[in-house]
Amino acid sequence: MKHNSPLNNKVNNHSHTTPNTHRVNDAMEAILTRNLYYKEQVTNTPAEYYYHVGDVSFDGYRDGVLVDARGEGLLKYIETNWTASVYGNGGLVDWALRKLEAVHNAGATTPIQWHIAEKDTFDDLFNRQKSGEFPAEIELIHTPPN
């Protein structure tokens, strides 16, 4: 890129390089695809199906239980204390509270299960649950992906 500097009237050459994001995008797409398969594994329904309660959605409803599938990729948010998480700075804890609130506001007592693919993510949430930092009303289940 060329541009005239008003200070010295000289032409400056600035090079601009576009970063190669294909590897990042490919890796993210692979995780998203695996998570869709994981959701289907956990819910036994097509990935595009959701079960809505108020303004929140669950991945499925099975045997009288609202089901959410927490696939791969959450460990990085735990390691950074949920900053920059798609779930907000409160992370999955805030997300869980929103889901519980929606069920309670609907006047329901339907149980909620979270199936968690990553063992480290499961362990973190389980420990938070034991210490009262994660809602005890949500049953946490470690379900490894097929």
For each of these PLM feature ranges, what is it?
Residues 1-146:
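Catalytic toxin/effector domains delivered as secreted proteins or via bacterial secretion systems
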